[in-house]
Amino acid sequence: MTFARINNVELNSESEADTFISNFTSGKFREIFPEAEILISIRTGPSSVTSVSVYKNKKTADSVADRRKSTIEGLKSLIKYLALTEGKVEILDLKKDSGVGTF
């Protein structure tokens, strides 16, 4: 069962959102969560970010829980609000040769 974790994060300011995002660019996101099959962060507003991590199964997702917690703890001063949701991926349809890749 493919499993996803979704983090909705509201940062204290736009500049702190920039700082938050910069902590995950240039492959850092992948270094922190190498078990994830898909990692995506979406800037949903000037000071908000939604991140989605997709794993092969819940067991794999659960195996990185402590790492996720310590990563968030290290960025705690930037965060105004954080909501975590998770669940079974029901549809995953990636267009073949879409050109979408690592940014």
Listing of model-derived features with the role each one plays in the protein:
Residues M1-E73, S77-F103:
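Short S/T/G/P-rich N-terminal loop/turn motif that feeds into the first structured element of a domain
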